[in-house]
């Protein structure tokens, strides 16, 4: 399982995960990334999303229609910047991940998890077993 110590985070990773920051749209690692695999919490290594639920949303950040496991996600009311939004945090590491909105694909439940690339690490499908995520392989065989 991939894990990262909070002290080893780069400036953007720290800003996003620990200070509730947001990385620039269209200038982040995974906004236009559609390789088969999973996205794990940058700090805890817990699986959060899969490429199977990722979709193009034109917002500039990775977007997913649902989380891999609801128990790994915490949703909180966010009233910053004069808006009311739903913040998404990881349960285990308490990392700020992004926000969830009700404007996702209707056929997939209508949600759009808008996630900062700096908060997650991508694990390619081919490396799932090797890196300790082999139990997720059946998720891709549906």
Swiss-Prot record:
This protein's record includes keyword Oxidoreductase: yes
PROSITE patterns, A to Z: MSRB
Active site: 114
Catalyzed reactions per annotation: L-methionyl-[protein] + [thioredoxin]-disulfide + H2O = L-methionyl-(R)-S-oxide-[protein] + [thioredoxin]-dithiol
InterPro entries: Met_Sox_Rdtase_MsrB, Met_Sox_Rdtase_MsrB_dom, Mss4-like_sf
Any Gene Ontology biological process: protein repair
Gene Ontology terms: cellular component: cytoplasm
Keywords: Oxidoreductase
GO-annotated molecular function: peptide-methionine (R)-S-oxide reductase activity
Domain MsrB: 2-125
Enzyme Commission number(s): 1.8.4.12
Family annotation (Gene3D superfamilies): Peptide methionine sulfoxide reductase (2.170.150.20)
Domain of life: Bacteria
Family: Belongs to the MsrB Met sulfoxide reductase family.
Entry protein name: Peptide methionine sulfoxide reductase MsrB
The species this protein was found in: Staphylococcus saprophyticus subsp. saprophyticus (strain ATCC 15305 / DSM 20229 / NCIMB 8711 / NCTC 7292 / S-41)
């Amino acid at each position: 399982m991939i894990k990262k110590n909070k002290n080893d985070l780069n400036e953007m990773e720290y800003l996003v995960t620990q200070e509730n920051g947001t990385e620039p749209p269209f200038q982040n690692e995974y906004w236009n990334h559609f390789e088969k695999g999973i996205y794990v919490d940058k700090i805890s290594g817990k699986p959060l999303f899969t490429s199977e639920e990722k979709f193009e949303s034109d917002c500039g950040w990775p977007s997913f229609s649902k989380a891999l496991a609801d128990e790994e996600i915490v949703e909180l009311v966010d009233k910053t910047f004069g808006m009311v939004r739903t913040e998404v945090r990881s349960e285990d590491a308490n990392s700020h991940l992004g926000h969830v909105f009700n404007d996702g694909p209707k056929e997939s439940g209508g949600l759009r998890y808008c996630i900062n690339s700096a908060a997650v690490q991508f694990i390619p499908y081919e490396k799932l077993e090797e890196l300790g995520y082999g139990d997720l392989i059946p998720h891709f065989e549906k």
